Amino acid sequence: MSEQNNTEMAFQIQRIYTKDISFEAPNAPQVFQQDWQPEVKLDLDTASSQLAEDVYEVVLRVTVTASLGEETAFLCEVQQGGIFSIAGIDGTQLAHCLGAYCPNILFPYARECITSLVSRGTFPQLNLAPVNFDALFMNYLQQQAEGEGAEQRQDA
């Protein structure tokens, strides 16, 4: 048996933590006088880095902006971090784990933090729907493949 066949896949959460939090209500208290019919915008971003052999940090950045017309009611940003031990996988499987599986684990923590911050700002409760990070990751891979295809066509 080769050494590669002996390597078992292993996944463990070492730590989940809040890396950064920001909440702004730039138009308070005037915004509280208006009818609450906001336009809510959700932005997501993930980043990962290798900390040691088989140890990775994944950071999920969630930004929620609620606007009433042209005015920002609130802007809330949370960077939810996690340290994960991941062994026995590489390539596309590792990229999927770091880009979809780990963010799926982190999102409920970020969502709870955002809900709490919005509530502390005395705004109506904000319920963020679950996010399909697997679909987002597949879209990312497709965009990468299309980008490489375009580069190859330009080189030809």
Curated annotation (Swiss-Prot):
It holds the Pfam family SecB. It is found in: Cytoplasm. One of its GO terms (cellular component) is cytoplasm. The keyword Flavoprotein does not apply. Keywords: Chaperone, Cytoplasm, Protein transport, Translocation, Transport. GO terms for molecular function: unfolded protein binding. Belongs to the SecB family. HAMAP family: SecB (MF_00821). Homotetramer, a dimer of dimers. One homotetramer interacts with 1 SecA dimer. One of the proteins required for the normal export of preproteins out of the cell cytoplasm. It is a molecular chaperone that binds to a subset of precursor proteins, maintaining them in a translocation-competent state. It also specifically binds to its receptor SecA. This is Protein-export protein SecB. It comes from Yersinia enterocolitica serotype O:8 / biotype 1B (strain NCTC 13174 / 8081).
